[in-house]
Amino acid sequence: AKIYESAPNRCNVIANIEGSDTSRPGLVVHGHIDVVPANAADWSVDPFAAEIRDGMIWGRGAVDMKNVDAMILAIVRKWARTGYKPPRNIVLAFFADEEAGMTFGSRWMAAEHPEVFAGCTEAISEVGGFSVTVGDGKRLYFVEAAQKGIHWMKLTANGRAGHGSMMNDENALTALSEAVAKIGRFSWPQTYTKTVKILFKKIAQATGKPYNEEDLRPLLKEIGPTARMIGATLQNSANPTMLEAGYKANVIPGSASAVIDGRFLPGYEAELNETIRSIIGPDISIETISRDIALEVDFEGDLVDAMCNAITRHDPEGIPVPYLMSGGTDNKALSELGIVGYGFSPLKLPADLDFMALFHGVDERVPISGLEFGVNVLADFLENC
């Protein structure tokens, strides 16, 4: 293994595993080694103690994504001990900084050390292959095949500063507030990508509910708490998240700013930007704070077949389905190198577990039985892909 330090205390760990057929394109198997902070006072356990309770491992990173990192390491440790060679070359990549925009992790590696990934055409990583129980107990395994893009923008309204006791028809804060309220209340049109259509057809088939391509929203209730995340993938979105204006109660500020978290579907970035502009009008400026691409790849081919076959070999009643993720992963950075990525970190979950709420949540935890299932499925996949 080799360590690539992009900045002080920002390390990326890369290892190469030679396959039995080195003429085949390589596979990147990657995870991130950072986690978001945790306020210990909010937790029922020490968030960094990895306590085992009620058949689960509790702690920050248990689902995002130390669980996957641990599965990967368990598999390659077994290979090292037995001398096993996978069918193709594998690049193991453990990135820094995924939770902070990937700047010193996958983005830095792709920009500064693309040679690390030379010969690789495909990748797998987090947030995919987890089970969602629907209908009369059928399990759908959600494999990530698409991701929304990001456009964080700062809106600024300028006006006439003055004394708070005076009338002011050029109040920047008033203008900004009206614009922010319009954005927050805007009803974005439903737009369904190919990945979303495939997913909802599978949901309809598994539950026996009608499939109406004109309005997929009625099917959301069939997937329980997962609907919160999947519902966000049926349209673009823009949420006001921060406000900044003024410095004293009796001073009308000359400017006021707000931050908007915009998310766009694959192929619909222009629509997001044009809609925001039309909502707020011409007098408020827009500054890009951060932008990242959207992704969508085909849910077909040998790699997808290998993922699906690995799932059904270990859960014959399981139904692999593609889904569009409302957030993003390090696969976005690797896509800039032409690498096609999927979210495949299999977990068989209890039907009543609100899995999505655990990401960055209080009392984050992962079922040990899910990990045991996942490591077997992941090993099966890696040994047959």
Which residues are covered by each model-predicted region?
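A non-catalytic alpha/beta surface segment that caps or lines the substrate-entry region
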Residues: 1-24, 49-50
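Active-site metal-coordination/substrate-binding segment of hydrolases
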Residues: 23-91
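Acidic, glycine-rich active-site loops and adjacent beta-strand->loop/helix elements
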Residues: 33-35, 94-102, 126-131, 161, ...
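Short, conserved micro-motifs enriched in small and acidic residues
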Residues: 57-70, 99, 170, 365-372
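Active-site-proximal alpha-helical scaffold in enzymes
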Residues: 68-83, 103-111, 172-175, 182
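Beta-strand segments within the central parallel beta-sheet cores of soluble alpha/beta enzyme folds
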Residues: 87-95, 121-125, 195, 323
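A glycine-rich helix N-cap at a beta->alpha junction
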Residues: 111-129
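Metal-dependent amide/peptide-bond hydrolase catalytic core
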Residues: 129-379, 383
